[in-house]
Amino acid sequence: MPIKKPCLKLNLDSLNVVRSEIPQMLSANERLKNNFNILYNQIRQYPAYYFKVASNVPTYSDICQSFSVMYQGFQIVNHSGDVFIHACRENPQSKGDFVGDKFHISIAREQVPLAFQILSGLLFSEDSPIDKWKITDMNRVSQQSRVGIGAQFTLYVKSDQECSQYSALLLHKIRQFIMCLESNLLRSKIAPGEYPASDVRPEDWKYVSYRNELRSDRDGSERQEQMLREEPFYRLMIE
């Protein structure tokens, strides 16, 4: 006689967790958007920041002729196969990730060496919030190259918090740093270069422009420009 087995039904309802109750992994950009108002208000509570200007910095000719050398805690690397000279702080101040935010500085081609001389004290400053930057070796680019007529300097911004987030203090320092770069160039009457079509900038920036390289491309478009102008990082720099 067959054994009658009890009818067992597994209740799956208890295993189905409502999706909205699961903390979703937000992107760094979404987190920055969510914290925008808080950061905006915190930034405005900080006083003006004054950067100590580095002394004994190299000239543009020095870094063009060097292969690998250390200046003011920055390793300068100039490979013959690269049109850029790279600078990277040996002991980074920002320990977070690079999430695509960067600035370009565009200078008239013939004034790039002079612009470097004007900005080098800030770029090599121990107070600089920029751990990594690069500059075009003008001897290696054509007359009409994108990084010859503009965008000769690139400043890479790294986050300093968990989940690739920026602290209000770092954002404040970056804002102030960009203002100092702009004012030094303007005061020295340096001629601006052609800023990249891929970037955005407010009307009062004459040399510096912004781009997030993870959410844009070099070609640029109206749609990309609008998107970049809505980037929370960019808005926190200009508003």
Curated annotation (Swiss-Prot):
Superkingdom of origin organism: Bacteria
Effect listed in the UniProt record for changing D160A: No change in Erk2 phosphothreonine lyase activity
Major localization class: secreted
Molecular function (Gene Ontology), one example: lyase activity
Record's note on what induces expression: Transcriptionally activated by MxiE in the intracellular environment of the host, in association with IpgC, under conditions of deregulated or active secretion. Expressed in a VirB-dependent but MxiE-independent way under conditions of non-secretion.
EC category name: lyase
Subcellular location: Secreted
InterPro entries: OspF/SpvC (IPR003519), OspF/SpvC_sf (IPR038498)
Alphabetically ordered keywords of this record: Lyase, Plasmid, Secreted, Virulence
Pfam families assigned to the protein according to its UniProt record, in alphabetical order: VRP3 (PF03536)
Signal peptide: none
Effect of D127A: No change in Erk2 phosphothreonine lyase activity
tRNA-binding keyword on record: no
Impact after mutating D137A: No change in Erk2 phosphothreonine lyase activity
Active-site residues from the entry: H104 (proton donor), K134 (proton acceptor)
Protein activity control: Inhibited by the tyrosine phosphatase inhibitor vanadate.
EC number: 4.2.3.-
Cellular component, GO annotation: extracellular region
NCBIfam families according to UniProt: PRK15245.1
General function of this protein: Catalyzes the removal of the phosphate group from the phosphothreonine in the mitogen-activated protein kinases such as MAPK2/ERK2, MAPK3/ERK1, MAPK8 and MAPK14 in an irreversible reaction, thus preventing the downstream phosphorylation of histone H3. This epigenetic modification results in inhibition of the transcription of a specific subset of pro-inflammatory genes, and ultimately to a reduced immune response against the invading pathogen. The diminished immune response enhances the bacterium's ability to disseminate and multiply within the host.
Family from the record: Belongs to the phosphothreonine lyase family.
UniProt name for this protein: Phosphothreonine lyase OspF
